Amino acid sequence: MELSSSSSTTQIPPWHLKADYVETCNCDYGCPCIFDGFPTYGFCRTLILYHIREGNYGDIKLDGLDVVTAYSWPKAIHEANGTMHLYITKNAIEDNVRHALIDIFSGNAKGEGPFALFAQTIKYILEPHFVDINVKIDGKKSSFSVPNIMDVQVESFVNPVTGEEQDTRIQLPKGLIWKLAEAAKTKLMRITTPTLNFDDSGKNAFYSVVEFKGP
């Protein structure tokens, strides 16, 4: 369905998130989008995990919950017409917790981070799915999956001569999402749904710890 503006007149409560962040996309290593805005192959597809270490939406606690954002844009992100699908852990049982996560990650709750900005580039937003999300947080060796839907495994770069694991980091003092991230690559990165169906294994990945607040 087409994304429409929220008609709610309810005041947005103060919110805060601190999360492990695992980003994977279809760009070559390092992802040129973060430097000049244009993807390696002219389009952008990404699967991103947020493992919330601590968080709240007003009085609603969000600690320990997982959210995956799946995006696809036909061109660069800022050229719009994108598609978004949220996958939220089944562990978010209460309706108010689910609504809080949807408000934040859809951009309706405004605030810091990519959510509100990305929302302006999305033409189609799919109904959120509440699913089992399997998560392993281990820096540049993190992984996450949703059974029968997506599978992501991240791995470090390795020196081809010595076999030594590389310590690769990117620093962006004015970065929108992160200021410092560990650069990695995907051993596996795929999603299979009727709307989003791609396999971009062997491409770019980042691991970071991010912190946002709003509104």
Go through the PLM ranges and name each one.
Residues 8-57:
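N-terminal ordered "arm"
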Residues 64-215:
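Internal, well-folded beta-alpha domain core
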Residues 48-73:
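Short, intrinsically disordered, low-complexity segments enriched in Ser/Thr and Pro
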Residues 16, 39-46, 60, 79-87, ...:
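Short, well-ordered strand-loop elements centered on a beta-strand within folded domains, enriched
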Residues 1-14, 212-215:
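Basic/polar N-terminal segments that are highly enriched at the extreme N-terminus
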Residues 1, 52, 93-96:
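Extended hydrophobic/Leu-rich segments
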Residues 4-6, 13, 26-30, 63-67, ...:
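A short linear-motif detector with a strong N-terminal bias
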